[in-house]
Curated annotation (Swiss-Prot):
UniProt organism field: Escherichia coli (strain K12)
Gene3D superfamilies for this protein: 3.40.1350.10
Protein name: Putative nuclease YhcG
MF-aspect GO terms: DNA binding; nuclease activity
Record note on quaternary structure: Interacts with DNA processing enzymes, including the restriction complex HsdMRS, the integrases IntF and IntS, and the recombinase PinE.
InterPro entries registered for this protein in UniProt: PD-DEXK-like_domain (IPR053148), tRNA_endonuc-like_dom_sf (IPR011856), YhcG_C (IPR009362), YhcG_N (IPR041527)
Domain notes: Possesses a PD-(D/E)XK-like nuclease domain.
Keyword Nuclease: yes
Protein purpose: May be a nuclease involved in DNA recombination and repair.
Effect of inactivating the gene: Deletion of this gene results in a synthetic-lethal phenotype when combined with hypomorphic alleles of the replicative primosome (dnaB), DNA polymerase III (dnaN), and DNA topoisomerase IV (parE).
Amino acid sequence: MESLSEGTTAGYQQIHDGIIHLVDSARTETVRSVNALMTATYQEIGRRIVEFEQGGEARAAYGAQLIKRLSKDLCLRYKRGFSAKNLRQMRLFYLFFQHVEIHQTMSGELTPLGIPQTPSAEFPSAKIWQTLSAKSFPLPRSTYVRLLSVKNADARSFYEKETLRCGWSVRQLERQIATQFYERTLLSHDKSAMLQQHAPAETHILPQQAIRDPFVLEFLELKDEYSESDFEEALINHLMDFMLELGDDFAFVGRQRRLRIDDNWFRVDLLFFHRRLRCLLIVDLKVGKFSYSDAGQMNMYLNYAKEHWTLPDENPPIGLVLCAEKGAGEAHYALAGLPNTVLASEYKMQLPDEKRLADELVRTQAVLEEGYRRR
């Protein structure tokens, strides 16, 4: 390939940098548009639910069953994202954020009715899209979900504006709410100084990270793929094979299984079904020493699995926390949720020994680390 002359190097660098800026900007705007349209759609669903409930006494009486029936029918169509809890959240979202303005779109001049005069506007679906896409939702969907927990309207508006002004992430917003930043600002004699003390914005989130937001994946019905480090992924793969090689009792159910508790998303590394014990086994891999917080998190997973994943004829689920540390390993079963000690004893007899699992964890780490050193 013929190299560029020195005289054209500066020109090449200019077009190279310009294309990178163009692509990066387009990706960022694409994610922003997906988020805004998704959030606007959920608000519109909430509006329709509220207006249906307010459509007369007959509908008001039926409203108690509306969300339950909608959830059942929509889940048949879309599989996920439309639980009764989510629909109630959409309803609340509309009630709390009716102030969102609708701006003029770029697709054409607006008619007196506010619908752009384009050929696509002849179709009802196009009109709906143009209305929704024009709504201004600059914050991520997860931020609005967190704001719903703020019951005081003034406080909610304050946190919304400060999140926009300061560029807070959801985690930073949660921290400000937890430390009562709004109340402290009200009580302060120098409110301007308080507002200048806001936390700095977190590092800019890349588009590929934003598009993996569970809310976005759920809305688009995309496969929930989770990016792990090569080492952790290899470790989980080996552990999965090792568990299945222990005998015919273990049946593989899934990996990186996602669950939502309140407004937070979690993932369990491996999920098995033990045929003889007739129960689910949740495996959680931790890098580092075992801590009480690991046990608490596993108990939270087990409570969720018992309510949402366990079938009526199955026994309560059990957990296995595997802790991998350089040159060491630990394995701990979580059996506290079982109804009696007899069942717990039976489980222990049927399950692989904790020491055997810990030894396998250490051996696997050594093999993988040796493989990486030889690359």
